[in-house]
Amino acid sequence: MSRLSSLVLTLSVAGFPALAQSVTGDEAASLLFPSAPAAVEIDGQGVLAKDEAKMLAMVAQDQPYYAAIAISPDEGLMSEATIAAANHHTIEAASAAALGECNAKKKGAADCVIVAFVRPDGWEARPLQLSMAATQDFANYSGGALAISAATGAWGMGGSADEAVAACVAKQEAATDCTVAIAD
């Protein structure tokens, strides 16, 4: 089974990965990746020409992690259906967002495919992952709580769990799934 097929199966069965429990600020500091640089992985899925893959790699390197780029195989890279979903808290969430929006915009019959991923350099799965922007903002964390939205990539900090969730929801109207990821 291809990696993309495994990803789609995982997303369809499990939805977005959920953080089992919050971690402390000190634990978070040891789990988070540096906010830069990001590494780009191109997987052309047999639908990208070499020059398109090279161009996509150049564009993708400027996207904040976690990001995924989806294209419609019937329409190609230079289509309105091509979507980059960036600044999510996991690659799975970015992939689901990119595929969902691409499939909604495509005109061709074939389902969209992920052709690029952007992750932190040296990425490995960890119990806590934050988007690049949330990781940068974590530098301002001085206690309280930090909440995240798996679906949208939104986050918010506050003096309490309730304040952090409210700040997360306030960042993005669609962030209805905000949960506390870091709490002291």
Where are these regions (language model features)?
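Sec-dependent signal peptide recognition
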Residues: 2-10
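N-terminal signal peptide c-region/cleavage motif recognized by signal peptidases
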Residues: 15-17
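Secreted/extracellular ectodomain signature
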Residues: 21-184
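Initiator methionine at the very start of the polypeptide chain
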Residues: 1-2, 20
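Short N-terminal leader segment in a subset of presequences, especially plant chloroplast
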Residues: 9-13, 29-31
